[in-house]
Amino acid sequence: MQTLHALLRDIPAPDAEAMARAQQHIDGLLKPPGSLGRLETLAVQLAGMPGLNGTPQVGEKAVLVMCADHGVWDEGVAVSPKIVTAIQAANMTQGTTGVCVLAAQAGAKVHVIDVGIDAEPIPGVVDMRVARGCGNIAVGPAMSRSQAEALLLEVSRYTCDLAKRGVTLFGVGELGMANTTPAAAMVSVFTGSDAKEVVGIGANLPPSRIDNKVDVVRRAIAINQPNPRDGIDVLSKVGGFDLVGMTGVMLGAARCGLPVLLDGFLSYSAALAACQIAPAVRPYLIPSHFSAEKGARIALAHLSMEPYLHMAMRLGEGSGAALAMPIVEAACAMFHNMGELAASNIVLPEGNANAT
């Protein structure tokens, strides 16, 4: 059975030759070179992924939603009751939440995964529960390092199993009351930013309670002293089971040479962890939308990412990842279905990339 170390070691590098061939093909399509902008860049990125066999393509699509509760909820950093995590997870199994509707529209399947809900097991939810909620990061670590490593490996294997069954495009999502607090702590640690710069309102936290949330994040970092150069240390000390789970999806998809669509702020924090654990993950990540959460810009700048959509969304759940799946499919359609300049006897002058 593959270990986490072996999985990380075996993440393939992008195929530079396939990317060069894709760029050459795109430049010869029936349009001025570069005129489809980032759609062209996305197609080239996809072409370099070994799991797609050298060409932009999308088979089955899946959004993996990691559900967990957080001990830091006790610090008054969220307005919703903790039980909402379990209620919404059950709603997801019925297909009635935001991510389910958007995923269905995109033709993607939603996998609802319990990695730490503080409730009885929920029918229809995949059971990977580590515990009933993680520790309160304001007073100690979220979990042990061994728990984080075991969950990373389990989720990575689950992701790779889906790849073997035909999934070629993954999206990540999460569900957990109070989880923007550990996400903000992780972003603060990885980017070296003060908590005040990255703490936002989450799920409509009143402005009068923001200062407390900032203080909680600062305390969590001061008490746990996470090492920003050790992604697993950060996840285990100031993260949460849902954030570890999303990181595991990224590691697993990268191991299979397949793309992962990020969601919003929570997924940015997991992406920072994934890229710290294994920098080889970065070429497989695709930013979907620009989260409305306060620390989004700082996290994305650290990842050197510019999302494709600006929708003022902050729902989470993987909703942005599902919404962006048709953009990935559009890049593939452009690559395979457009005509070629050579076949149309059109010769464009150089420097005509901005023509319409």
Curated annotation (Swiss-Prot):
Q: Which reaction does it catalyse?
A: 5,6-dimethylbenzimidazole + nicotinate beta-D-ribonucleotide = alpha-ribazole 5'-phosphate + nicotinate + H(+)
Q: Which domain of life is it from?
A: Bacteria
GO biological process per UniProt = cobalamin biosynthetic process
- Assigned EC number: 2.4.2.21
Q: Which residues form the active site?
A: 317 (proton acceptor)
**Gene3D superfamilies in alphabetical order:** 1.10.1610.10, 3.40.50.10210
Q: Which Pfam families match?
A: DBI_PRT (PF02277)
The residue range of the signal peptide is none
Per UniProt, which keywords does this protein have? Cobalamin biosynthesis, Glycosyltransferase, Transferase
Q: Identify the metabolic or biological route this protein is part of.
A: Nucleoside biosynthesis; alpha-ribazole biosynthesis; alpha-ribazole from 5,6-dimethylbenzimidazole: step 1/2
Identify the InterPro entries for this entry.
Answer: Nict_dMeBzImd_PRibTrfase (IPR003200), Nict_dMeBzImd_PRibTrfase_bact (IPR017846), Nict_dMeBzImd_PRibTrfase_N (IPR023195), Nict_dMeBzImd_PRibTrfase_sf (IPR036087)
List the Gene Ontology MF annotations in alphabetical order. nicotinate-nucleotide-dimethylbenzimidazole phosphoribosyltransferase activity
Task: State the oligomer form and interacting partners.
Answer: Homodimer.
Query: Family per UniProt?
Result: Belongs to the CobT family.
Role noted for this protein: Catalyzes the synthesis of alpha-ribazole-5'-phosphate from nicotinate mononucleotide (NAMN) and 5,6-dimethylbenzimidazole (DMB).
Question: This protein is called what?
Answer: Nicotinate-nucleotide--dimethylbenzimidazole phosphoribosyltransferase
Source organism per UniProt: Salmonella paratyphi A (strain AKU_12601)
